[in-house]
Amino acid sequence: MKTCVITGAARTAVGAYLGSLKTVEAQDLCAAAIVEAAKRSDIELGELDEVIMGDVYGYTPNVSRCAALVAGVPEEIPAYVVDRQCASSLQAVVSACQQIMSEEADVVMAGGVEVMSRLPFYLDPSARYAPFRLGDKPLFDTFNHGVTMVSSKKYPGLNMGLTAENVAEKYGITREELDAFAEDSQRKMAEAQ
């Protein structure tokens, strides 16, 4: 069985919600990261066997494919998206490793993309089969309403951010402890390179 290694990484700037990146399409941000990760790994985009990206809200159909094409990945190289909520980009990396270890691929670009400021609003599903006649109909915010639709009926309305806050409160985890854990994680990543 082949061994899977991460040869390089890149990320784009992180902006505030509805901030300076609000007009940038997800595929354009992702394409920039693909190009830079390939450069840091000293690989040509044509060497890729697959591109896999995690994307939770997915307003661009197969944003992985769109980003790959924008980045200059040859069109014969396939790409797909995984959605595992907050672990989507991690699942993309796991899926890439699985392909390499099973000898389905040699070189895979994997990561994630999300542009929260570009999330669409949507209509109540009944609008599809009961067209509007008279009266107002609500719009739903994808982030506020859509994310809670995947939650269990037992815990309605809890997205990952609220869940993290509840867990921190329940177990007495301080912000300083979280920051120290994050710093240690970054240190380990730097040492591993």
Language-model regions: role of each:
Residues 3-8:
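Conserved PLP-binding active-site segment in aminotransferase class I/II-type PLP enzymes
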Residues 47-54:
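Short glycine-rich phosphate-binding loop at a beta-alpha junction
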Residues 1-2, 17-46, 61-62, 68-69, ...:
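Acyl-thioester C-C bond-transforming condensing/cleaving domain
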Residues 9-14:
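Short polar catalytic/cofactor-binding loops
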Residues 55-60:
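Glycine-rich phosphate-binding loops at beta-strand->alpha-helix junctions
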